[in-house]
Curated annotation (Swiss-Prot):
Interacts with XRCC4; the LIG4-XRCC4 subcomplex has a 1:2 stoichiometry. Component of the core long-range non-homologous end joining (NHEJ) complex (also named DNA-PK complex) composed of PRKDC, LIG4, XRCC4, XRCC6/Ku70, XRCC5/Ku86 and NHEJ1/XLF. Additional component of the NHEJ complex includes PAXX. Following autophosphorylation, PRKDC dissociates from DNA, leading to formation of the short-range NHEJ complex, composed of LIG4, XRCC4, XRCC6/Ku70, XRCC5/Ku86 and NHEJ1/XLF. It is an enzyme of class 6 (ligase). It comes from Gallus gallus. The active site is at 278 (n6-amp-lysine intermediate). Its EC number is 6.5.1.1. GO terms for biological process: cell division; DNA biosynthetic process; double-strand break repair via nonhomologous end joining; immunoglobulin V(D)J recombination; nucleotide-excision repair, DNA gap filling. This is DNA ligase 4. PANTHER family: DNA LIGASE 4. Mg(2+) 1 binds at residue 336. Belongs to the ATP-dependent DNA ligase family. The keyword Hydrolase does not apply. GO terms for cellular component: DNA ligase IV complex; DNA-dependent protein kinase-DNA ligase 4 complex; nonhomologous end joining complex; nucleoplasm. It catalyses: ATP + (deoxyribonucleotide)n-3'-hydroxyl + 5'-phospho-(deoxyribonucleotide)m = (deoxyribonucleotide)n+m + AMP + diphosphate.
Length: 912
């Protein structure tokens, strides 16, 4: 058994406390290096068998043993980890930590290798593989023999995650130092991959599960709990008799496959089928048992805190608790969480840069659960029942309440024409698409295409407008794309004078999908000799970029035009055009066009203004030639195309993302809104591709909230002051650099108190570091953020005061408080203001000393100040019970005493 003097021994006997971490690493190394699948399987099975054998010897006479293979499994499949919080560490941060902890010269060869791990060096083919590069840097500096056990590694990783959550960087470094000083270079290579959550084993998690136990994958699908899988299925000879959906246990939802419009009748077995609108919200499952509710996202993350655990809290549960039929004790419902606008009586779409995941009580929009399936009713499990029967049961579960809980409307059909009519109607309504479902289908967790199909306009050739864009920039790839350009920055041309060629190009989007590795390689060869490093300090004058900058650029005359297909054009300040494309994909290289024949700004504006930016501008008509035709209102004819599913949309299915890297391994995000070319769902898909996890509402494990465009929900999240709210630009930079980019003030929309305190010590309010050198380009960027606002918002004043420790100033003693003064005869009727009372003076004092005084008693108020008249206090307390955040009711003495002493007095002694 390996020893580690710096760590406390485990109080309980476990296999993990006896197994050297080196044994696990050597097994992983053998699995990765061998080529054949049987060999890989054998190495893992041998390790697993030895673990189980030792387990039997260790616990032979014990009962109710909870020790299992979980400590090893969570390291082998780190992307499925749910218990441990985010590490907050990716490649670049690891590189900086290694440079610091190993005392490497910052400009030295090894430090440069670590920091620029994605840049090809011409030596080994390790470009983009940080763990391999780190291995060769660490090899001469690391101990020859490791001293850690599997259990100790997990304890140190727990410490890193916990200290990252507590924003304690010092303790994070301390734990990392213990890992470094007690691990060999080989062990650290695998530690890095575990932290980044991309082991690159060349074997799928499905294979790992199947070797562990025949029922493992199925149990994980209905529980999303790796520890439960390892504990319940420790004995490979014991089978689960009933692996099924359980109340209050998150399951992976059933998914839809892409439909072939031409074959839809055959795919539905030439029988009657259902057509539903495909909702553009967040997939959510609701579990209810009496007054207890739980909500889970499609990835098994818990959003109960946001939507409500009981009838008295959350943005949804209080409004729907009473709509359930009296005989319903418990149930599990599957559906889509949407944002509903009661004024227009419409649902918000993701393209509107709105995200339901973080919405709380809101004056403009409200949470609405659109239910399309029921999986349990009064302890009766229904997954094995047909969809038609489940629909009948669903109709008797609750009474729909407009804007709060709906049953998704369906209609029966049996012909292709009815499907096409429904799709055309969805196009006209600017909806995402339609669903087609087999009435006889049963519910199969995590299965795709088992009777459920989806059709979106972008899946059908001929229905979307394509854009001919010029490649002007590139980004180095990582992993299998290491050493080549894997993503491209595309641009449109400034409209030239007649018969002139364009000279200036504006960036519009970054694209990284739609092509095979061979196509990417061929394109790379074509452009290879023309790439030049992009210098942020001295960018090319003919390529204008927004905040999204390429790593390399190419002169327009040496580049090629690519045909891009996308869902829609959306606003974005990341690109020079102030807009970008949602779900862009390269269809083909336009070999028939010269570089100067790309789309112009005028053409872009025409597309952008039409159909609210949607690029699905045509109706689908099936005639004898099966060709799509233009809508009648269109006047410019297009070339007719054969109808079918575009090939590039078959592989990258956004609703079933395949992991391509471990950049965000163990990092939990809450994406509220998208930006530019990246919609909310695209950002979530990219996060999933990078190994991260996405929740619909933030919780204690959420690393940060990603925001592209601010809205009412974002403001409510900021008002809660619990989470770090970060611009989507930061996420895009992470994607661009293939690592977790350290936060800078420019990325932050709102900071939690801990983060704000950290930033106040290192940056000024415009993002200029107190200690790091600043170049001209960075300084210009800082200056661009200095706004000449005549009136500074109170929250910004409060942030500045806190950041620079000005909050001890006597003029800001009430800063950060939103206060309602009780000088209105009727609550929430400003026209009934009572004049000539002392409270009018108190209100002036509150404003003078930094408070925000409001005329309405609503969500967000922190204090209510009462004078001599207490007649309205009872009504205020009744209102307070309905609020998510409770306000304090204090006497006016709290104001006068605080002003007198120059500090905010504790409200306790002034409460009413």
């Amino acid at each position: 058994m390996a020893s580690a003097p710096v760590l406390q021994p485990s109080p309980k006997r476990t296999v993990a406390s006896h197994v050297p971490f080196a044994d696990l690493c050597s097994t992983l190394e053998r699995i990765q290096t061998c080529k054949s699948r049987p060999e890989k399987t054998k190495y893992f099975k041998d390790f697993l068998d030895s673990w189980r054998k030792f387990h039997s010897a260790l616990h032979q006479k014990e009962k109710d043993v909870t020790d299992s293979f979980y400590p090893a499994m969570r390291l082998i499949l780190p992307q499925l980890e749910r218990e441990r919080m985010a590490y907050g560490i990716k490649e670049t941060m690891l590189a900086k930590l290694y440079i610091e902890l190993l005392n490497l010269p910052k400009d030295g060869k090894d430090a440069v290798k670590l920091l620029n791990y994605r840049t090809p060096t011409g030596s080994r083919g390790d470009a983009g593989d940080f763990a391999m590069i780190a291995y060769f840097v660490l090899k001469p500096r690391s101990p020859k023999r490791g001293r850690l056990t599997v259990e100790q590694v997990n304890e140190l990783l727990d410490a890193i995650a916990n200290n990252n959550a507590a924003k304690n960087k010092g303790l994070v470094k301390k734990s990392l130092l213990q890992l470094i000083t007690q691990s060999t270079a080989l062990e650290q290579k695998w530690l890095i991959r575990m932290i980044i959550k991309d082991l690159k084993l060349g074997v799928s998690q499905q294979t790992i599960f199947s070797i562990f136990h025949p029922d493992a994958a199925e149990l994980h699908n209905v529980t999303t709990d790796l520890e439960k899988v390892c504990r319940q299925l420790h004995d490979p000879s014991v089978s689960l008799s009933d692996v099924s959906i359980m109340l209050f246990s998150a399951f992976k939802p059933m998914l839809a496959a892409i439909a072939d419009v031409q074959q839809i009748e055959k795919q539905m077995n030439n029988q009657v089928f259902y057509i539903e609108t495909k909702l553009d919200g967040e997939r959510m499952q609701m579990h209810k048992d009496g007054d207890v509710y739980k909500y889970f996202s499609r990835n098994g993350f818990d959003y109960t805190q946001q939507f409500g655990a009981s009838p008295v809290d959350g943005s949804l549960t209080p409004f729907i608790h009473n709509v359930f039929k009296s005989d319903i004790q418990n149930c599990i419902l599957d559906g889509e969480m949407m944002a509903y606008n009661p004024e227009t009586q419409t649902f918000m779409q993701k393209g509107n840069k709105f995200d339901i995941k973080r919405m709380v009580e809101d004056s403009d929009l409200q949470t609405c659960f659109c239910v399309f399936d029921v999986l349990m009713i009064n302890d009766q499990k229904l997954a094995h029942e047909s969809l038609s029967k489940r629909y009948k049961i669903l109709s008797n579960v609750f009474t729909p309440l407009t804007g709060r809980i709906h049953v998704v409307h369906k209609k029966s059909a049996r012909t292709r024409k009815e499907v096409i009519d429904a799709l055309n109607e969805a196009i006209d309504n600017r909806e995402e698409g339609i669903m087609v479902k087999d009435p006889m289908s049963t519910y199969k967790p995590d299965k795709r295409g088992e009777g459920w199909l989806k059709i979106k306009p972008e899946y059908v050739n001929g229905l979307m407008d394509e854009l001919d864009l010029l490649i002007v920039g590139g980004y180095w790839g990582k992993g299998s794309r290491g050493g080549m350009m894997s993503h491209f920055l595309c641009a449109v041309a400034e409209t030239p004078a007649p018969n002139e060629k364009p000279t200036v190009f504006h960036s519009i989007c970054r694209v990284g999908s739609g092509y095979t590795m061979k196509e990417l390689y061929d394109l790379g060869l074509k452009l290879a000799k023309h790439w030049k490093p992009y210098n942020r300090k001295d960018p090319p004058c003919n390529i204008l970029c927004g905040t999204e900058k390429p790593e390399m650029y190419i002169e327009p005359c040496n580049s090629v035009i690519v045909q891009i297909k996308a869902a829609e054009i959306v606003n974005s300040d990341m690109y020079k055009t102030d807009c970008t494309l949602r779900f862009p994909r390269i269809e083909k290289i336009r070999e028939d066009k010269e570089w100067y024949e790309c789309m112009t700004l005028d053409m872009l504006e025409h597309l952008r203004s039409r159909a609210e930016g949607k690029l699905a501008s045509k109706h689908l008509y099936i005639d004898e030639y099966d060709e799509p035709q233009e809508k009648k209102r269109r006047t410019v004819p297009k070339v007719k195309k054969v109808i079918g599913i575009a090939e590039q949309f078959k592989a990258p299915d956004l609703s079933n993302v395949n992991k391509v890297s471990s950049m965000f391994e163990d990092v939990e995000f809450c994406v509220m809104t998208g930006m530019g070319r990246y919609s909310k769902s695209e950002l979530e898909s990219r996060i999933a591709e990078c190994g991260g996890s996405v929740v619909q509402n933030p919780g204690p494990d959420t690393y940060c909230v990603i925001v592209g465009a601010e809205n009412v929900r974002v403001k409510n999240i900021i008002a809660s002051n619990k989470y770090d709210v970060v611009k989507a630009e930061w996420l895009l930079q992470c994607f661009q650099s293939k690592m977790l980019v350290p936060w800078q003030p420019a990325f932050m929309i709102h900071m939690s108190p801990e983060t704000r305190e950290h930033f106040a010590r290192e940056y000024d309010c415009y993002g200029d570091s107190y200690t790091a050198d600043t170049d001209v380009a960075q300084l210009k960027e800082v200056f661009s953020r200095v706004k000449d606002n005549k009136k500074m918002p109170l929250d910004l004043i409060a942030e500045l005061e806190e950041r620079y420790s000005w909050n001890s100033c006597k003029l800001c003693i009430f800063r950060g408080n939103t206060i309602y003064v009780d000088y209105y005869a009727i609550i929430n009727k400003p026209s009934t203001k009572i004049h000539g009372t002392r409270l009018s003076i108190r209100a002036l004092e509150l404003r003078f000393y930094g408070a925000k005084v409001v005329p309405l008693l609503e969500e967000g108020v922190s204090h209510v100040v009462i004078g001599e008249d207490h007649s309205r206090v009872k009504e205020m307390k009744a209102l307070r019970r309905m609020f998510g955040k409770k306000f304090k009711i204090v006497s006016e003495l709290w104001v006068t005493e605080s002003v007198k002493e120059g500090v905010p007095k504790n409200e306790t002694q002034f409460l009413i």
